[in-house]
Design a protein with these regions (language model features):
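Two-metal-ion RNase H-like nuclease active-site motif
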Residues: 24-33
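Short glycine/serine/proline-enriched coil/turn segments at secondary-structure junctions
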Residues: 34-38
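Metal-dependent phosphoesterase core characteristic of DEDDh/y 3'-5' exonuclease domains
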Residues: 40-57, 91-155
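Nucleic-acid-processing active sites and adjacent nucleic-acid-binding tracks
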Residues: 57-77
Length: 155
């Protein structure tokens, strides 16, 4: 398993702090070997959070052997405890159910009910007509907004 952490600065990101006050926000994304929660596994979890100076820390847990899914899930669950708000893109439909199901396989309980949730996909979906031909896939929204990618960065 590889764990990597780095910091970046960006003035182009929307400042969600204004919407959430003093609450600590964790942005996260997962990468999986497929869409089946039962047959496929999570090989990467990326998480980002804002520092007091406006910079962002990014941490990634990568299962480079195909045998460390349990390790990255345990590390993510422990890390998650430090936050109040969980932000993602289509996480309510994909990422969170996938994490919960894969955690249950190993006896790891993820209780997302205690967090305030922010799913960017659900926020922009009502405005789909404004995006014309876009499918609202994460990559297309990133290109459209010309922003720092919402997902994880390559190791």
């Amino acid at each position: 398993m590889i764990s990597k952490e780095y910091t970046f600065y960006s003035k182009r990101l929307y400042d969600f702090d204004e919407d959430y006050g003093d609450k600590k926000i964790l942005y996260f994304d997962i990468e999986t070997t497929g869409f089946s929660r039962e047959n496929n596994h999570i090989y990467l979890i990326g998480a980002a959070y804002k520092n007091a100076d406006g910079s962002f820390n990014i941490i990634q847990w990568f299962d480079d052997t195909g045998k460390d899914e349990i390790k990255i899930l345990l590390l993510f669950r422990e890390f998650l405890k430090n936050f109040d708000v969980v932000a993602d893109y289509n996480g309510n439909s994909f990422d969170i159910p996938f994490v919960i199901q894969r955690g249950l396989k190993y006896g790891i309980n993820f209780n997302f009910d205690k967090y305030e949730m922010f799913d960017l996909y659900k926020k922009i979906r009502p405005y789909k007509k404004l995006f014309k031909t876009l499918s609202l896939k994460q990559k297309q929204i990133e290109i459209f907004l010309k922003r720092v990618p919402l997902g994880v960065h390559a190791l």
